[in-house]
Structures are given as C-alpha cells and as structure tokens.
C-alpha cells in the first residue's frame, strides 16, 4: 500500500514532542486524516492537554481512554501470577503496557475505519516490535507506519526545529530538554538516555521521581498485610480494593520506604544491549509477597515447574508476544495453578528492603506444623522412613561408584 492509498491513520498519541511532530508529518507526508489515541495508564501526567494539541492540529476524532483498571487487572496482575522477571531483574513495566495500547489502537482503527496505525517508537528499540507484533496478531492486514524508520529527523533538536517551523504547540524549548527519556505507567517509571548511556555513570539522585533514597527513608519500618485470592491481591490491611487501587497504594508505600529502584543493562530483542533505570515500588512488593503466599499454598512440583517456565513467559512479554498462542497456553497453566493461592502475607518495608515476616492460609496451606516441628511430633512423621528414601535415591550413585566412577 503506497502513501497515496492511506486515507486515515490511528496514531498512538501522547501529546509530547515526538508524537506531535509525527501527527503533523503524517498529515503532510501521507495527506491523510489522523485519529489520535491517548491512553491513561496511570503515568501521573495530565492527559487532557493532548486533546487540545490534537484539536489545534485539526484532528476531528480524538480518543482519550482511562485504561488504568484494565491495565492492572488484565495485564499486570496476570503477569505477577507468573512471578515474571526478565533476565533475573527487570519487572517488565514498559513491556506489559504495550499489548494493551496495541489492542486499543486496533479497536479504534476498526471503529473509525482507519486503514493504518502509527506509533512513535524508534527503529532501535523493543517497542516497535511489541506494538507491531500485537497489531498484526489482532488485525493481520493492518498497515503500520513507523515514522522513525522513514523520516530524516534524527535528533531532538531537529524535531524541535520541525515543530517550530510548523507552529506545533510544544512546551519544551530548544536546549532545555530533559536529560532522560522517560516512560511511566501504574507499574513503573523508566529512565534512559543522557548520562545513562555510559554504563559506568551513576545517575543523579534528582533523577528518581517515585521514591526516596533508601538512605533517607524512614528509620522505622512499615508493616503491610496483603490478602490474596487466586493469586491476586484483593485487599491491603483488610481494605478491599480494585487492582488499580492496589497498585497505586503499593507504589505509595514502597516509594516512601525507598523500595523498587533498579539500574541494569538488558539485552534488547533487536540485538543490542541497553542501560535503563527503573522505579517499580509496588511491583517489587508484589513479587516478594506473591512468592511468599505460593510458598505455603503450592505443591512443590507445581512451584518448581512454574519457576522453570517463568523465564520463557517473561521473554515472551519482553519480546512482544503477549498476543500469541504460546503466551496464552502458559497463562492458562499459570492461572490454573493459582486456584489454591489464597491467604495473607505480612511484609516489612524498611530502607529499600522488602522482608516477608508472615504468611498464612486458612483454607489452602500445605504447611503442617505437626510434621515440620523440631519438637516432639507425637508420631506424625516416622524418621525411620528416611533411610529407605535415601538408599533408593543413592542407588544409581552407588552402582556407578562400584563400577569405578569418580565424582570428586
């Protein structure tokens, strides 16, 4: 499909510099009508100004959707049932937001009769892959326009010059841009670029926006009780909440105690290494607490199998395969495992640390104090049974040893 065949484009629009320039560029380059879509994922910024900017550039169809609850309930919570982390550290805050944006963008394209969608992801990053894999899965014949892979605007300064030359309303001025590229939603805020491109450079304390430094966190710990039903947090300190409210509250509690900061170099799907800094206070608490409630409610082999599958599941999300048959299959297995994950976890938040200090389940605990006790178990467990168990498991080792094998 050539540019002349594109009549209407649905644009994922934040109202910032990049997507505002993209909006005008689409109008000029493709001569098409543009529909804008702005998602409120709990990024903490006013999204309504995006409406005024889009209107000022002649956009007739403007969508601004509050997706905070859907994001938390249908994307973040299912991911945390799996205890998903990428490369042992990253809690996938950016990755998990992209499939929802792609889904809603395709829905809007269908509603408005758009024959193409557009996004502001660069040609170097993972987001282009995540947006487009999702879009093609949900509408195989959709045309995707990725301006960063087409135009000759290669820097923030050239974008600002373009905006000025066309009267695009942009708050930031040339030479006064933020040193970091930031992305936020209810799960996290990320920082890239600037001095972070040097993996040896320590970020300034002023970069962090959601959390106090652990050194300056309160000198007294905060205790929190989290109630779980089927693997999801449904109440904090006994107060039942929606998924979005749970995440917002845990972000507050974690941020106030210096929890959730992360500075990593990760392997992007496109092949390069990238350094990023993240604040995920609520998610950090959720991961620790969920593993704790699973520790007393999951069968050993089920728990171990989940741990084996988790890296694969996390990679699927990181690489953009949320809308795939393999992710769906894994999700069904994970969700089935959570039927018994019910109970309460008590955590202590103190100077950047999350410590589990209690866990209980009235209906589904597999922890038997009568068997596990170091005191007199009154015959609940016959220690003599261990001898046969050990000998059976040692049989292959003993046979190999008799045949001359050396394990030292």
Curated annotation (Swiss-Prot):
Which Gene Ontology molecular function entries are recorded, alphabetically?
argininosuccinate synthase activity; ATP binding
Q: What is its main location?
A: cytoplasm
Which PROSITE patterns does this one have? ARGININOSUCCIN_SYN_1, ARGININOSUCCIN_SYN_2
Where ATP binds, per the record, is at 12-20, 39, 120
Q: Name one GO cellular component term.
A: cytoplasm
What is its pathway? Amino-acid biosynthesis; L-arginine biosynthesis; L-arginine from L-ornithine and carbamoyl phosphate: step 2/3
| Quaternary structure and partners | Homotetramer.
Which family does the similarity line name? Belongs to the argininosuccinate synthase family. Type 1 subfamily.
Name of protein: Argininosuccinate synthase
Q: Which organism is it from?
A: Methylococcus capsulatus (strain ATCC 33009 / NCIMB 11132 / Bath)
């Amino acid at each position: 499909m050539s540019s002349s065949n594109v009549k209407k484009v649905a644009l994922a629009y934040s109202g910032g510099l990049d997507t505002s320039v993209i909006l005008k560029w689409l109008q000029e380059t493709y001569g098409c009508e543009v529909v804008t879509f702005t998602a409120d994922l709990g990024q903490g910024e006013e999204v309504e100004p995006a409406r005024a900017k889009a209107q000022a550039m002649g956009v007739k169809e403007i969508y601004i959707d509050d997706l905070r609850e859907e994001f938390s309930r249908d994307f973040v919570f299912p991911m945390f049932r799996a205890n998903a982390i990428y490369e042992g550290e990253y809690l996938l805050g950016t990755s998990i937001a992209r499939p929802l944006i792609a889904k809603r963008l395709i829905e809007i394209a269908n509603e408005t009769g758009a024959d193409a969608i557009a996004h502001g992801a660069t040609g170097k990053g993972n987001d282009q892959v995540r947006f487009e894999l999702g879009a093609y899965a949900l509408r195989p014949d959709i045309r995707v326009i990725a301006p960063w892979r087409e135009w000759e605007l290669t820097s923030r300064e050239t974008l600002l010059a373009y905006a000025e030359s066309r009267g695009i309303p942009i708050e930031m001025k040339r030479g006064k841009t933020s040193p970091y590229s930031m992305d936020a939603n209810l799960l996290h805020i990320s920082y890239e670029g600037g001095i972070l491109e040097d993996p040896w450079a320590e970020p300034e304390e002023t970069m962090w926006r959601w959390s106090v430094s652990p050194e300056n966190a309160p000198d007294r710990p905060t205790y929190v009780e989290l109630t779980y039903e089927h693997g999801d947090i449904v109440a904090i300190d006994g107060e039942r909440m929606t998924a979005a409210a749970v995440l917002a509250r845990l972000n507050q509690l974690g941020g106030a105690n210096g929890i959730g900061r992360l500075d990593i170099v990760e392997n992007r799907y496109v092949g390069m290494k990238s350094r990023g800094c993240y604040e995920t206070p609520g998610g950090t608490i959720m991961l620790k607490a969920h593993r704790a409630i699973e520790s007393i409610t999951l069968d050993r082999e089920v728990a171990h199998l989940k741990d084996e599958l988790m890296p694969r599941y996390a990679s699927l999300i990181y690489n953009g395969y949320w809308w795939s048959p393999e992710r769906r299959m894994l999700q069904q297995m994970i969700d089935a495992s959570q039927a018994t994950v019910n109970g309460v976890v008590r955590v202590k938040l103190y100077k950047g640390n999350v410590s589990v200090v209690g866990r209980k389940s009235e209906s589904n605990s597999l922890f038997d104090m009568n068997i596990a006790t170091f005191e007199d178990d009154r015959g609940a467990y016959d220690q003599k049974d261990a001898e046969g168990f050990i000998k059976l498991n040692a049989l292959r080792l003993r046979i190999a040893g008799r045949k001359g094998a050396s394990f030292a």
